[in-house]
Amino acid sequence: MSQSLLHSTVSDFFDLYIPNSNAVRDIAVAVSGGADSLALAHLLNQKVSSDLSHIDLHVLTVDHGLRPEASDEAEHVGSIVSSWKNATHQILKWDGRSAETGIQEKARNARYDLMREYCEQHGIKFLFLGHHGGDQFETFFIRLSAGSGPEGLGCMAPVSVQNGLNLCRPLLYQSHEDLVSYCQREDIAWCEDPSNEDDKYERVRYRKAYEVLSSEGLSYKRLNKTLERIRQMTESAHVFSNEKYDELLIKKETDRILFNLECIKALPLDTVCRIVKRAIEELSDERGYGPRTEKTEILTKDLLEGKGFRKRTLGKCIFEVLDDGEKFSVSKE
């Protein structure tokens, strides 16, 4: 892909998703030091410098402290950004060495938490991320293999909103190779992560399957179009299930939610699954994706079959039928 097409990709993204960019004063971009995020940061800086000079670009690098070279890589990003107009670099630090288990997930959560806090403090509403077509491909097949439901299979949208912050991904139709070539042409030195070639990681194994599947017609463009349809159908189902949730809600307390069970049994399986998931989310104090779809479906099927639903737990909540089958209760464990 030519440089002009990549520049057009970023410009088109602003036109489509940030049409009021004249009112925007600051944007941020997450940069690890790899080719993907550095290419995106450079493209954004070019856009800001040429067309949106009123916008300041905040380049954010999180130093997890998990690898000896992490600090050097963060400083390397700063040395590159120091020569750019309209751009500043910030290193956000998190000490991951104190985490004994689930280090990768905790590091990912910490990364987003630190960047979100920075954006809140500086009034930034748009955080750009360097996810590309290859990342989308890997994410889809990882989630498919794990049995994800429609929400999970929708993968990454060009823009998603979390706690008022717009997460922007303009490169979902581009390849890693496109971005490496861009860095080479612009003489941008990037850092290589050895784990990107290590077969012990699930993502790497799926990445190597792309060559075969792309030869059968599964391009990044075709995959993203399919995922867009999945997200549209999911949103419609989400709106409908929320309407039914409110209609069938009998009582909501701090630690318990009661529903009209007779009316619940008249709903489709997918809708009831969504009601169950929302109840868990509203009672849960923990972050995360919640119970696996398969487990939620098993509970929901048993509830709808009406053959003596047994009290059970799921997602740290207790599910039981009360008052001779008239009410369905979800309470904190």
Task: Mark where each language-model region is.
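Conserved anion/nucleotide-ligand pocket segment
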Residues: 207-222
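AMP-forming adenylation/ATP pyrophosphatase catalytic core
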Residues: 3-36, 54, 58, 94-96, ...
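Solvent-exposed, charged amphipathic helical/linker segments at domain boundaries
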Residues: 63, 223, 255-257
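Short, surface-exposed helix-loop/turn micro-motifs enriched in polar/charged residues
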Residues: 129, 194, 198, 222, ...
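Core alpha/beta nucleotide-donor-binding catalytic domains of modification enzymes
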Residues: 2-209
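Internal, active-site/partner-interface "lid" segment
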Residues: 196-203, 221-232
